[in-house]
From Swiss-Prot:
Kelch repeat spans: 170-216, 286-337
Top-level lineage group: Eukaryota
Name of this protein: F-box/kelch-repeat protein At1g24800
Keyword list, A-Z: Kelch repeat, Repeat
Record lineage: Eukaryota, Viridiplantae, Streptophyta, Embryophyta, Tracheophyta
Length: 433
C-alpha cells in the first residue's frame, strides 16, 4: 500500500499559536476589579466604567449600590466649585500609626457655573448657582443633569431643599425670601411633571433656610433647625435677646406641609453653633458646640448626636461623640464657628469629620480650609485642605476690600448612587402654576 507523504511530515506550528493569549479588561477576576479598581475610581467616572462590559456594570451595582464600600464617598463645595470627597480612616488598636486617606477632587462637569451649595437626597445632588439664577439636579452615577430655572425672579436670599414623596416622586422645595427677610413664601417643583406650584404653608417657628447648614434630607423629608419667634424670646436689661427655644421642623414632601416641633437633645444658647448632618439618608445627626459663657472659656466641648428613630412628627436621640476642646486652646486649633462646621460621621471608626476654616490667629496672614477629624480617647487631627481666598468685594466709595471667607460645605451623608433618571424631557416645556 502506498503511504501518503503528508502522514510522515511533522505538523507545522503557526506563529499565532506561540503568542500568549491576550487578557481583556473583562477577564480580570471580579474580586480584583471590586477591591483594587472600583474603590479607586471617582464616582463621577462610574458611567464610563459601567460601559466597559456587562461584568463591570454588574460589579458597580453590587459594590456601590449594594453599600459594600467601607469609605465615605460624598461631595462638597469649596471656592464655589463642586468636589468629590473620599475618606477612609483605620485606627490602629496597637501603637502603630493610624492610616488615613482624605482625597478631594474637583468635578469638571459643573465647571461652567459657580456653585454655592449642594444638597443630597437619594443619590441625587441639587446644586445651587452662586447667583441663585438656576439650580441643577445631577445624578453622578448615571452622569445625567437637569437645569432648572426658578418660577419667579430669584433673590440672593432664596434657598432650596430636595426630597421625595411616598411614591418616590422627587421634588424641590424653594423658599423665596420676601422684603421682610424673616418671612418666606414657598414653591415646589415636581421632577416628574416638570412644573412649579405655589404652596400655602406656614412653618410653626422661625427658620433661616438660607443658612447652608440648617436643612438636611433624611428618608425623603427635609429637617430644619428652627427657633421660636424672636418677639417671644428672653431679653436682657439692654434689650438684647439672650434665649430662644430651639427645635427641628420637618417638611414632609408627601403632604407638602411642615410638621410639629421636634425636640433637640440639648438647649442651645444664642452664641452656640448648631449644624445638621445625616447618616446614609436614614438618620439625622447634629453638631452642638457650646463656646462657654465667658470670653476666656471659649474652648469647651463639641457634642455629636444621632437619631435612633426619626419621622416627620417624632424623634429620639443618642449621643455619638463628645470632644473636649480645652486641651487644644494653646495650639490655636479651633472651629471658626461663623458659617462653617458642616460635617459627616464614620460610625465604624467612631469619628466625626468637620469642615471649616482654621481658627484665626492674629499672627497669620491667611486663612485655610481645614478638615477637623475627632474621635474617641482624645483623638483630634486637623488636616489643611488649602488656602481660603478672600471673597470680599471692594467698597464702591472707598475701594476698601473687607476680609470675607467662605468655608467648605460638605454634603452630609455618605453618597449611595441612584438609578433615578433626571434627564430633561425635551418635548415638554417647563410649566408654572
Amino acid at each position: 500500500m502506498r503511504r501518503r507523504r503528508c502522514d510522515l511530515q511533522p505538523k507545522r506550528t503557526r506563529m499565532c499559536d506561540l503568542q500568549p493569549k491576550r487578557t481583556s479588561m473583562c477577564d480580570l477576576p471580579p474580586k480584583l476589579v471590586g477591591e483594587k479598581i472600583l474603590t479607586r475610581i471617582p464616582i463621577t467616572s462610574l458611567r464610563a466604567v459601567r460601559s466597559t462590559c456587562k461584568l463591570w456594570n454588574a460589579l458597580t451595582k453590587d459594590r456601590v449600590l449594594g453599600k459594600a464600600a467601607a469609605q465615605f464617598l460624598g461631595f462638597m463645595t469649596m471656592d464655589s466649585k463642586v468636589c468629590s470627597v473620599r475618606f477612609h480612616l483605620r485606627r490602629s488598636k496597637e501603637e502603630e500609626e493610624d492610616t488615613m486617606d482624605l482625597s478631594i477632587k474637583q468635578v469638571d462637569l459643573l465647571n461652567q457655573v459657580e456653585i454655592s451649595r449642594v444638597y443630597h437626597c437619594d443619590g441625587l445632588l441639587l446644586c445651587v448657582a452662586k447667583d441663585n439664577s438656576r439650580v441643577v439636579v445631577w445624578n453622578p452615577y448615571l452622569g445625567q443633569t437637569r437645569w432648572i430655572r426658578p418660577r419667579t425672579e430669584s433673590n440672593i436670599g432664596d434657598s432650596y431643599a430636595l426630597g421625595y414623596d411616598i411614591n418616590r416622586n422627587h421634588k424641590i422645595l424653594r423658599m423665596v425670601q420676601t422684603r421682610n427677610v424673616s418671612v418666606y413664601r414657598y414653591e415646589i417643583y415636581d421632577l416628574r411633571s416638570n412644573s412649579w406650584r405655589v404652596l400655602e404653608v406656614t412653618p410653626n417657628g422661625e427658620m433661616d433656610p438660607n443658612h447652608p447648614l440648617y436643612g438636611v434630607s433624611v428618608k425623603g423629608n427635609t429637617y430644619f433647625f428652627a427657633h421660636e419667634d424672636s418677639s417671644s424670646g428672653e431679653i436682657d436689661e439692654d434689650g438684647d435677646i439672650i434665649d430662644l427655644e430651639d427645635f427641628l421642623l420637618c417638611f414632609d414632601f408627601t403632604t407638602e406641609t411642615f410638621g410639629l416641633r421636634l425636640p433637640l437633645p440639648f438647649h442651645s444658647t444664642i452664641d452656640a453653633t448648631v449644624t445638621l448632618s445625616c447618616v446614609r439618608d436614614q438618620q439625622l445627626a447634629v453638631l452642638y458646640h457650646n463656646e462657654g459663657l465667658h470670653s476666656d472659656d471659649r474652648f469647651t466641648t463639641v457634642e455629636f448626636w444621632v437619631t435612633t428613630s426619626i419621622e416627620p412628627n417624632s424623634v429620639s436621640w443618642s449621643k455619638f461623640l463628645t470632644v473636649d476642646m480645652r486641651p487644644l486652646a494653646l495650639t490655636g486649633v479651633r472651629f471658626d464657628n461663623d458659617m462653617g462646621a458642616t460635617f459627616f460621621i464614620d460610625e465604624d471608626e467612631k469619628v466625626a469629620v468637620v469642615f471649616d476654616l482654621d481658627g484665626y490667629l492674629s499672627t497669620e496672614s491667611a486663612r485655610y480650609h481645614t478638615a477637623f477629624i475627632s474621635g474617641k480617647d482624645g483623638f483630634f487631627k486637623p488636616v489643611t485642605l488649602g488656602v481660603a481666598p478672600n471673597v470680599g468685594e471692594p467698597c464702591p466709595r472707598t475701594g476698601h476690600i473687607p476680609t470675607t471667607y467662605r468655608p467648605p460645605l460638605v454634603c452630609s451623608s455618605t453618597y449611595l448612587p441612584s438609578l433615578v433618571q433626571v434627564n430633561q424631557q425635551r418635548k415638554r416645556k417647563e410649566r408654572h402654576v
